[in-house]
């Protein structure tokens, strides 16, 4: 197989984004990379209005770590993309939306670009240098992208609906 510029382009998008998302999950799950681990993440989730903060923090960490791994490997790409969209939409709405767009002010720029990239990846597919392609189960196209977006936004809406509605917080600048 001859590796093309397109193969390399999608690989260069997938791997760093997936690994960085795994890192965010590891911060929540294990306290690695300067993260707070389950205790501090649970406290943050409670401050953001989520019930059972520790459990919700573990779910967010697992979502980020698992989706990040899937994105990096190009495995179960539409499902991995949906998981990334779910976690990043929750982060954008619960922790960043009130701070505006730009990341330097704690805004939702970073989760927005990751979620949009995930939707784009679901449309484009993970490319030939992926687990999906190696297993012959690559799923891509507009229908798969829209399905990932719908599943991701639906999952986010379900989790966001659990939050306490009258909670006002002063969350850390980089909680997710």
Regions found by a protein language model. Give the residues of each.
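Extended, low-polarity transmembrane helix blocks
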Residues: 1-28, 76-176
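Solvent-exposed, well-ordered loop and adjacent helix/strand elements within mature globular domains
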Residues: 20, 24-60
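Amphipathic alpha-helical interaction elements
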Residues: 30, 71-74
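Phenylalanine-focused residue identity feature
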Residues: 30-33, 65, 108
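Internal, well-ordered alpha-helical scaffold/interface segments
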Residues: 43, 60, 74, 84-87
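Hydrophobic alpha-helical transmembrane segments
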Residues: 55-67, 82
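Hydrophobic, membrane-inserted alpha-helices
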Residues: 63-71, 95-96
């Amino acid at each position: 197989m001859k590796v093309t510029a397109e193969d390399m382009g999608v690989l260069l998008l997938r791997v760093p984004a997936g690994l960085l998302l795994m890192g965010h999950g590891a911060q929540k799950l294990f306290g690695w990379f300067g993260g707070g681990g389950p205790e501090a993440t649970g406290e943050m989730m409670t401050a953001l209005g989520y019930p059972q903060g520790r459990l919700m923090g573990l779910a967010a960490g697992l979502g980020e770590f698992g989706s990040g791994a899937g994105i990096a490997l190009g495995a179960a790409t539409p499902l991995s993309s949906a998981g990334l969209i779910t976690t990043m939409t929750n982060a954008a709405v619960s922790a960043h939306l009130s701070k505006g767009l730009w990341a330097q002010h704690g805004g939702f720029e970073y989760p927005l670009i990751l979620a949009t990239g995930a939707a784009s990846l679901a449309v484009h597919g993970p490319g030939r240098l992926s687990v999906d392609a190696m297993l012959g189960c690559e799923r891509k196209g507009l229908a798969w992208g829209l399905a990932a977006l719908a599943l991701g936004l639906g999952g986010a809406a379900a989790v966001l609906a659990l939050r306490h509605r009258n909670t006002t917080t002063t969350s850390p600048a980089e909680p997710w």
